[in-house]
């Protein structure tokens, strides 16, 4: 969810968005309405975000900041514990401080729920910091594939050199790789 404005229903309340996510895969029926048990569960989940959203359950999602919406979207995506969580540049549209908070939240949720995640990013620092395996692609080909201790000991400069060696050329834009 590259765009924090996607993944949620802007005209609906926070608790309504969470209710839709919680009922994903179920047949809609008369018991689909929000109840106190769901409300309490949603409040507890939102408290973990530490964004104050638990006190704004009836606020329209369209009134939230990009970071708040991205955090809410992450909660909605993981509420049913997916087999694979695909994160496609999920912090790209956020300022650095908010991106760091969303990445920290992402890491907590993945660790807590023991999720398998695939994070796509152009930010090499994030690629090195998060996850247990790093794959770099160029023109549809895998050029770098590192894991474990090898990944843990790499620096951004090491990674750039590995990539340049595998690609057979130097890169034009450090911004592309450094984020």
Describe each model-derived feature in a short phrase.
Residues 96-98:
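Helix N-cap at the start of a conserved alpha-helix in ABC-type nucleotide-binding domains
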Residues 10-24:
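Q-loop/switch helix immediately C-terminal to the Walker
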Residues 121-122:
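H-loop/switch region of ABC-family ATPase nucleotide-binding domains
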Residues 100-113:
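Helical segment within the ABC ATPase nucleotide-binding domain
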Residues 141-167:
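Conserved beta-strand-loop-alpha-helix hinge in the C-terminal portion
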Residues 77-78:
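ABC ATPase C-loop
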Residues 85-88:
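Catalytic Walker B motif of ABC-type/P-loop ATPase nucleotide-binding domains
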Residues 81:
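Conserved catalytic motifs of ABC-family nucleotide-binding domains
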